[in-house]
């Protein structure tokens, strides 16, 4: 995994609802998080120098701020842990990427942003890639989130069972294979919605985005402020694009995927 400064640009936007006094006092918070995306891969920074544009992402920069200095963690798990826990990963042990079957994950004693915002009356949801633990005890819904719908690892780990070299022994897969896409709730309900196959990778970000929008709408209807952490799987290898985006830029898979991601941000 590349260093975090090349892995995840964080797009943070506060959406202010005006329907109630509580929403006016407490802003809705939506964090949009990409994967394996360098600062120079958005046209807000490269000014079109990479041969494609990301107008929806750029609009957030235009209405907010562009960061010119940054400190980054060395891996996906470490960076996500630093953000959601507010601690240096060496304190929590979340320094390397978590793999299927590992006991590594968010420790019980470490509060998350979700924990703190729930105390302030927020509805808390996490959608998309998590990578902060494989076991039920590590799921976001056991660490301050009302709802989680997402995958637990990087994409190349998800598609390993489809490769020719992956062990075919069912016992091996049960012990060490990746879990499917998980949908869980704070009341303890956990549903495995099936594997994140190569085919599902093409549209899974749309699944996650749809669930996130549904969650936000429900919070607004309930007159509750929300905190949503939306984690796209783009652009981690291996990236499987929707057919309509393949070749859309004419300059390669990565640019095509950035256009797809930008459209999802705009939706």
What would you call each of these model-derived segments?
Residues 2, 6, 20-267:
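Formylglycine-dependent sulfatase
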Residues 7-18:
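Bacterial N-terminal signal peptides
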């Amino acid at each position: 995994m590349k260093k975090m400064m090349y892995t995840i640009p964080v797009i943070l936007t506060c959406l202010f609802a005006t329907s109630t006094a509580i929403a006016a006092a407490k802003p809705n918070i939506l964090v949009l998080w990409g994967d394996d995306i360098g600062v120079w891969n958005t046209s807000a920074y490269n000014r079109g120098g990479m041969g494609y544009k990301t107008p929806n992402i750029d609009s957030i920069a235009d209405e907010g701020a562009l960061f010119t200095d940054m400190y980054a963690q060395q891996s996906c798990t470490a960076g996500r842990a630093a953000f959601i826990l507010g601690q240096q990963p060496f304190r929590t042990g979340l320094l390397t990427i978590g793999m299927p079957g590992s006991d590594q994950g968010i420790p019980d004693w470490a509060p998350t942003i979700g924990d703190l915002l729930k105390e302030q009356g927020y509805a808390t949801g996490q959608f998309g890639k998590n990578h902060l633990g494989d076991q039920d005890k590590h799921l976001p819904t056991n660490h301050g989130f009302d709802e989680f719908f997402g995958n637990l690892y990087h994409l190349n780990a998800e598609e390993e069972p489809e490769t020719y070299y992956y062990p075919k022994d069912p016992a091996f897969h049960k012990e060490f294979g990746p879990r499917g896409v998980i949908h869980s709730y704070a009341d303890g309900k956990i549903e495995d919605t099936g594997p994140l196959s190569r085919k599902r990778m093409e549209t899974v970000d749309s699944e996650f985005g749809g669930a996130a929008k549904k969650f936000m709408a429900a919070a607004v209807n309930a007159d509750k402020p929300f905190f949503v952490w939306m984690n796209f799987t783009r652009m981690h290898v291996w990236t499987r694009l929707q057919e309509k985006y393949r070749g859309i830029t004419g300059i390669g898979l990565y640019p095509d995927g950035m256009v797809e991601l930008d459209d999802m941000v705009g939706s």
